[in-house]
Amino acid sequence: MTLEITGSELIKSKLIDAPERSGVYRMFDVNKQVLYVGKAKNLKKRLTNYIKSNLDNKTLRMIANTCFLEYSITNSEVEALLLEAQLIKKFQPKFNILLKDCKSFPFIKLRLDHDFPQLLKYRGKTLSDGKFFGPFASSVEVNTTLTELQKIFKLRSCTDNYFNSRTRPCLQYEIKRCYAPCVGKINKEDYRDLVTQVKDFLQGRTKELQENLSRKMEELSSQMRFEEAAEIRDRIKALSYVQLKAGVSDVVKDADIIAIVEKNGHYCVEVFLYRAGQACGNIPYFPTATENSTKEEVLEYFLLQFYQKQHVPAAIIINHEINDKENVIEAIKKINNILQINITVPNKGGKAKLVQNAETHALFSLEQYLKKFAKNQEIMFEIKELFGLSEIPERIEIYDNSHIQGKFAVGVMVVAGKVGFDKKEYRVFNVHTPSLVCHSRESGDPKRLMDSCFRGNGIKNCGGDIKGDDYEMLRQVLTRRLTRLRQEPHKLPSLMIIDGGKGHLGVVKEVMDKFEMNIPFVCMSKGVDRNAGFEQFHVIGKEVFTLDKNLPVMKYLQILRDEAHNFAIKNHRLGRSRAIKISRLDDIEGVGETRKKALLHYFGSYKAVCDATIYELAKVNGINKLLAEMIFNVLHRKN
């Protein structure tokens, strides 16, 4: 494709017809990938800035790569802000300020559609039916709170299916984490009273709750019901301890405390969550920013991107003013369909102290981040020199596979970046092995073999022996990966590392040639006796070489390889475990679909079936003692 004009000349040509109105513009590279999305109060004036002479290096690189430019007119600046935020979220342009790793925060959910409501963790922006408490800064925070609540209030956490299948109390009852409503150990009225207490606690009404419990304890004592009174006493003590440990603020009720700091062109935004006056944890973010970005700009973009995924509290308290605060407030209100929010920068008092605390945490988080970043950059430079790369790698993809003689085969990809592993980019490839030449040890019947490949376990793996064809598995994984990279060229890796040797090198070259791609790659194989520290590296056009096992770059490459290896084994075992759970019951003579369903319904889960005694198995409808013994023996046979 031949382009007539690009870069600044393209922008000059677009200026002729550019309107003096608010809107959003988009810059594209030669592959029509979005490089940058920007908003403007006046599109003509904003685009004019890109043909001036005092631009920073990153902006100059962006303009040089711009081959297409489009703009959209909006009715207001708020609309422009909204559209810009939506497009940045959708396209993740490389030259924009980006907020990465922004998962939605978890909540505690109390279901209200059951006679005995369930307490569970919930993640997602759309809050379905039920009562929600939070958000919490991390799964650790919410899991810890749930554990404490179960110790104190003993509400059920099981699913409805498990609840309905119980004929005896489960382990949670035995360890005093549940009152076992499933088998009538507590009535509806008493359980509802506990639900009300949980609501009061999570909504911050701890003083009223403790007063009510104290009155109830005295009442029970006066009635000589000392055991029940002692239980209430222990609950009051536990509530006091949890409240003290969680940290309670009398300064804010529902608020996000947000502080931004900068050092050497890197930014950290620390967010503290307060709900119902209780601290719900904190989390640091490290948005990527351009060279000439300011704190005001980074914080503005952070707020717009952050509150596209997170729930908005009544108050947002920040440590730095933003330029376009009123429009940002209006945009956040429209994004979340709410009527009122308040963004403030306190100068004194309790709120200012909370902001100062968040800023102190942000500085510490940024220093730790920069240490990790600097160390990683040193290693990345050594990798660049070692493998003759044109630039310091920003994204390294590492590939491995796992199987047992071709069964339950999976390939995996793990990703390492500027500051370590990027786990949200990890991928698992379920390898479809029936296309290979298979030899079943149990039967030469092709139909039976294909049936075993796709037996209703949801795992598309061959039940026969495919001779462990690593090359074909790698070919499939890379074919699927490169197909995806054609659609996502902005995710092209700087380097691919494949766990394998000379033969794998040829497969990678074959697939690369087929896709006409030129991504640098290297194969890393075990050395003598497959001992760590003697790894061999295979690169096209070079002799096989090894590295001193004490070199930092060698240790780093081993860490990359081991991460991929462990991720592959983990996912292989998951697949194998799912298949074994089903097939073990399927393989027992006399246990068909009806009896299998009866077993699972009676015990509630496959694990519970395995834990059952012969006597307990024989209590299931349709299972006699002889069959119970057979089931028990098969389930307790070693793999």
Swiss-Prot record:
One of its GO terms (biological process) is SOS response. Its main location: cytoplasm. Residues 207-242 form the UVR domain. CDD domains: GIY-YIG_UvrC_Cho (cd10434). One of its GO terms (molecular function) is DNA binding. GO terms for cellular component: cytoplasm; excinuclease repair complex. PROSITE patterns: GIY_YIG, UVR, UVRC. It is found in: Cytoplasm. Residues 20-97 form the GIY-YIG domain. InterPro entries: GIY-YIG_endonuc, GIY-YIG_endonuc_sf, GIY-YIG_UvrC_Cho, RuvA_2-like, UVR_dom, UVR_dom_sf, UvrABC_protein_C, UvrC. The keyword DNA damage applies. SUPFAM superfamilies: C-terminal UvrC-binding domain of UvrB (SSF46600), GIY-YIG endonuclease (SSF82771), RuvA domain 2-like (SSF47781). Keywords: Cytoplasm, DNA damage, DNA excision, DNA repair, Excision nuclease, SOS response. The UvrABC repair system catalyzes the recognition and processing of DNA lesions. UvrC both incises the 5' and 3' sides of the lesion. The N-terminal half is responsible for the 3' incision and the C-terminal half is responsible for the 5' incision. Belongs to the UvrC family. PANTHER family: UVRABC SYSTEM PROTEIN C, UVRC/OXIDOREDUCTASE. Interacts with UvrB in an incision complex. This is UvrABC system protein C. It comes from Rickettsia conorii (strain ATCC VR-613 / Malish 7). The gene is uvrC.
